[in-house]
């Protein structure tokens, strides 16, 4: 298990853009997707390659390809949808599933409302994506469910994380690697990441 805060000037710049309350919906979505690509770049360092032979304009040569058939991307709805385009731009042949979980604003407990996964999900390593890791409840629920379906490896990608959420996920699932664009200070008394960026789902879809 590893918790990796991905350090890069481009990430810092784009995190500033999505934190800014004056950033419009279009720019927010674009920056979110770009940060997602940068995180995935780091998270895919350990992917296995298959040796192949290709023909260049000059000769045949040994080369390597990713085994995309072994990968799946699963966003936690709805905010996780904002990360999908950025992730899929790098691994376009991966399959996509969806898990719908929302947080009860009074109890802060996760509530499940939807799930659709590839039929062969038990043969795939999954990148689970959600912009915000706050209390960790939604992530833990989603990881629990993926493991119950036989998924051999789950890697969690998020944009912002609170220390409390990181601790909760690593305690519940010590085998899951977590890649984070930025670790924030703390949770507020209402369970929001501070200083945060607001409600990621609302900002992705322009609903507030």
UniProtKB/Swiss-Prot annotation:
<feature type="binding site">
    <location>
        <position position="199"/>
    </location>
    <ligand>
        <name>5-phospho-alpha-D-ribose 1-diphosphate</name>
    </ligand>
</feature>
<comment type="similarity">
    <text>Belongs to the UPRTase family.</text>
</comment>
<keyword id="KW-0460">Magnesium</keyword>
<dbReference type="GO" id="GO:0004845">
    <property type="term" value="F:uracil phosphoribosyltransferase activity"/>
</dbReference>
<feature type="binding site">
    <location>
        <position position="193"/>
    </location>
    <ligand>
        <name>uracil</name>
    </ligand>
</feature>
<feature type="binding site">
    <location>
        <position position="78"/>
    </location>
    <ligand>
        <name>5-phospho-alpha-D-ribose 1-diphosphate</name>
    </ligand>
</feature>
<protein>
    <recommendedName>
        <fullName>Uracil phosphoribosyltransferase</fullName>
        <ecNumber>2.4.2.9</ecNumber>
    </recommendedName>
</protein>
<dbReference type="GO" id="GO:0005525">
    <property type="term" value="F:GTP binding"/>
</dbReference>
<dbReference type="InterPro" id="IPR034332">
    <property type="entry name" value="Upp_B"/>
</dbReference>
<comment type="pathway">
    <text>Pyrimidine metabolism; UMP biosynthesis via salvage pathway; UMP from uracil: step 1/1.</text>
</comment>
<keyword id="KW-0342">GTP-binding</keyword>
<dbReference type="GO" id="GO:0000287">
    <property type="term" value="F:magnesium ion binding"/>
</dbReference>
<dbReference type="InterPro" id="IPR000836">
    <property type="entry name" value="PRibTrfase_dom"/>
</dbReference>
<feature type="binding site">
    <location>
        <position position="103"/>
    </location>
    <ligand>
        <name>5-phospho-alpha-D-ribose 1-diphosphate</name>
    </ligand>
</feature>
<dbReference type="GO" id="GO:0006223">
    <property type="term" value="P:uracil salvage"/>
</dbReference>
<keyword id="KW-0328">Glycosyltransferase</keyword>
<dbReference type="GO" id="GO:0044206">
    <property type="term" value="P:UMP salvage"/>
</dbReference>
<dbReference type="Pfam" id="PF14681">
    <property type="entry name" value="UPRTase"/>
</dbReference>
<keyword id="KW-0808">Transferase</keyword>
<feature type="binding site">
    <location>
        <begin position="130"/>
        <end position="138"/>
    </location>
    <ligand>
        <name>5-phospho-alpha-D-ribose 1-diphosphate</name>
    </ligand>
</feature>
<keyword id="KW-0021">Allosteric enzyme</keyword>
<dbReference type="InterPro" id="IPR029057">
    <property type="entry name" value="PRTase-like"/>
</dbReference>
<dbReference type="InterPro" id="IPR005765">
    <property type="entry name" value="Ura_phspho_trans"/>
</dbReference>
<feature type="binding site">
    <location>
        <begin position="198"/>
        <end position="200"/>
    </location>
    <ligand>
        <name>uracil</name>
    </ligand>
</feature>
<keyword id="KW-0547">Nucleotide-binding</keyword>
<comment type="function">
    <text>Catalyzes the conversion of uracil and 5-phospho-alpha-D-ribose 1-diphosphate (PRPP) to UMP and diphosphate.</text>
</comment>
<dbReference type="InterPro" id="IPR050054">
    <property type="entry name" value="UPRTase/APRTase"/>
</dbReference>
